[in-house]
Amino acid sequence: MRQLKITKQVTNRDTPSLDKYLHEIGKVELITADEEVELAKRIREGDQKALNKLINANLRFVVSVSKQYQNQGLSLPDLINEGNLGLIKAAQRFDETRGFKFISYAVWWIRQSILQALAEQARIVRLPLNKIGSINKINKTLSTLEQQFEREPSAEEVAAELECSPKDIKESLKNSGRHVSMDAPLSSSEDGTLYDVLDSKDSPT
């Protein structure tokens, strides 16, 4: 069976129509719990094909979760796009040694990604146009740097790219409902991240 290639670009607006997308993911074979374990091991070793397979097999679940958040400010395709981002993060972080199924872990990331997007949309519609322009510019830079670094950039890295202060970046992200990456370095000279500083009891690791 031809595998549907899923990467971060799945969230771009030039994806196929929703009906075609749903048809494509409906053809992807589901995987067993044992296969999840094997894929997780391969993902930790840097196997991109294993990552794609784990993501592909769970795309239908993202659609189901996304439907629960309709009529709250985002279209169903946009909700699915955001949910897919959460699914990708879950697949990259999944630890099979903890003994639970992948989807039980992934649902938290899927919902958080959708909820953050809904919160961002709700805040943006209340912002002045000049601030919306700044936020859009920052978001584009965030996306570009994320592809370049293969991780979410820090506020300092975004500020350096846009030639402004990290404080301005953080304030704009706060206004839009987005947050600085928990995984990004605290600064260019430090290896620690916010995950190292905070006791993250409310999120899976």
Locations of regions flagged by a protein language model:
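Alpha-helical promoter-recognition and RNA polymerase-docking modules of transcription initiation factors
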Residues: 2-126, 133-148, 203-204
